[in-house]
Structures are given as C-alpha cells and as structure tokens.
Regions:
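Residue-level recognition of short, well-ordered coil/turn positions
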Residues: 22-23, 37, 93, 171
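Catalytic cores of large soluble enzymes that bind and process phosphate-bearing ligands
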Residues: 2-6, 20-24, 43-51, 73-80, ...
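Substrate-binding/catalytic subdomain of NAD(P)-dependent oxidoreductase enzymes
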Residues: 28-125, 130-132
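Catalytic, metal-anchored helix/loop core of enzyme active sites in primary metabolism
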Residues: 2-4, 12-15, 31, 36-40, ...
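Oxidoreductase and adenylate-handling cofactor-binding alpha/beta cores
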Residues: 1, 14-18, 22-23, 53-67, ...
Length: 192
C-alpha cells in the first residue's frame, strides 16, 4: 500500500513556474507571495514542514496510530535550482515536492522530498496551486484525488466547509481517531 502526493499548493505553484518559465526559486517565491499563495514567512511550505504534517496525518489515518511529523525524513524545495528544473525537463521529468507513505509487511516508511516524476505518473500533470494524491492498494489498484491546494478562497472554503459539517452533524459526529501508540517509521535507506 502506498499513498504519495503533492500536498502543498504553494510549493507546487513555485516548482511549476520554475519549470514552465525557467525562473529562479527566489523570483517565483516572491510572485507566490504577491499572489497570496505563500505566506510572508514561507518556511513551513518551502522547507517541507506543511507537507510533512499532512503526511503524518495520512500515516496516522491508515495505521490507526499516532505519527509525529518530526519523525518523517523531510527535505523542502529551498535548494531546487532553475538548473535542476531545466535538467529534469530535458529528461522528460518534472520535479514535485512529494509526501509519501508506504507499508511493507507491517512496517511503515515515510518521506517528504523533491522528487523527479516521470510523464506516465498520474502526479506529473498536477501543476500550479493544485494538489494530487496517488493511492495504490492491493485491491484498489491505483486511484487519484485532485484539487486546489493554495490560495485564500480554497483554504477558507475548506475551513468553513469543515465547520458547517461539524455543526450540522454534531449529534452523530465521529471524528477520525487513532490510538496513543506511536508509529515507528523505518529509515528509507537512501531512497529519499
């Protein structure tokens, strides 16, 4: 079983613009801030911590146990250069910041890192402020979830939607929960 995704619209916007326009990381980050996609202090996004937190939530949901995002190998996009993007593009790849959770024989593996994604991967065409999650399961096969992941309106809409759902169904609301048992994440062995 594997869940791998582009979980941060801000970083995906930055990487998409760098790939499409050949612009530098710094210039693209400034544009993302001007458009309201990146915070004034973008560290949580560009250093991978937002994606790491979301990856920890996904791992907690599938395992039923707690996962600390600090336990997940995390590398952001701060060091991805326009030269890296040009090489990836020339080879037919796109660089995406991925959060990934894999289970193998009751062991859990997780990482967050910029990775080269090939054209045949369903995550390849996920561009701009969009997020995408690829889920691979034994019975399910491969499926994708896709939607906007950055900007004031998508964020506000998601928060308001959650509040309304909780209020409407408060009498029978059952949140997703997990035990207090902590997950042990296996080292990736240099894969990330």
């Amino acid at each position: 079983t594997e869940i791998t995704g582009i979980l941060n619209g801000t970083t995906n916007f930055i990487l998409t613009k760098m790939r499409e326009e050949g612009s530098s990381f710094e210039d693209t980050l400034k544009e993302a801030q001007r458009l309201g996609y990146a915070e004034r202090d973008p560290s949580a996004d560009i250093d991978g911590f937002d994606t790491s937190r979301k990856t920890a939530i996904l791992l907690s949901m599938i395992s039923g146990n707690r996962c600390r995002h600090e336990d997940i190998y995390t590398e952001g996009i701060r060091n991805v250069s326009d030269i890296d993007m040009a090489y990836a593009k020339a080879l037919g790849y796109s660089i995406k910041l991925l959060g990934s959770v894999q289970t193998v024989e009751d062991k859990y593996f997780a990482y967050v890192a910029p990775m080269m994604v090939e054209e045949q991967d369903p995550l390849y065409p996920v561009n701009g402020v969009y997020n995408g999650i690829r889920i691979v399961g034994n019975c399910l096969g491969t499926t994708m979830l896709y939607g906007m992941g950055a900007g004031k309106l998508p964020t506000a809409s998601a928060v308001v939607s959650d509040i309304i759902a909780a209020v409407r169904h408060k009498s029978n609301f059952q949140g997703i929960g997990w035990s207090d048992k902590m997950i042990e994440i296996e080292p990736m062995g240099g894969n990330a």
